[in-house]
C-alpha cells in the first residue's frame, strides 16, 4: 500500500517554441518518482500520434503509468504570450483525459494506493469526475492515506459543487 498516484490530465502544452508534456498530476507523479517512491500516472490519451508520444516520453523517463487509450483526441493546451509576456492558456475540451474510465485495474491500484493527488481541472467532465471519486472511495481509509486535492481555478472549469465535494473528500489541500 505504498503507491503514490497522480490522477487526472496528461497532455501536451503547445508553446510558441514547441510542445512539452504537461498536466499537474503527471508532473506530481514524475517528481515523486525522482525521490524513489513507487508512483503512477493515471490518465487517458487518445488513439493518436500525440498519445503515442506521451506514452513514449513517460517510458523514456521511467515513469510507471496506468493510462487508458480512449477514442478521444489526446489533450492539448495552447499557450500564447500576451504583449508583456504573460502566458494565456486555452485548454481544449472533449479530450481523452476528460474520459478516464474506471477499470478493474484501476480498482486494484486504488486498493494499494498510499497517496493520490487529484485536481479540479480533471473533474470538469462527468466521466473523469466519476472515476476520480470512485478511486477515492475505493482507497483504504486511514490516517496514513493521503488524498491531496489540487485546486486549479482556470477558464471556469470548475463548479462550487466540485470544489466542495473534493474538499470534503481530501485530507490535504493544495491551493495554486
Predicted region positions:
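Ribokinase/PfkB-type carbohydrate-kinase core domain
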Residues: 1-5, 57-67, 83-175
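A short, mixed-charge helix-start or loop-turn motif at secondary-structure junctions
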Residues: 11-14, 118
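Short beta-strand/turn micro-motifs composed of small residues
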Residues: 8, 43-45, 151
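Substrate-binding N-lobe of the ribokinase-like
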Residues: 3-4, 13-86, 93-100, 104
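Residue-level signal for short, function-critical loop segments
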Residues: 10, 45-47, 122-124
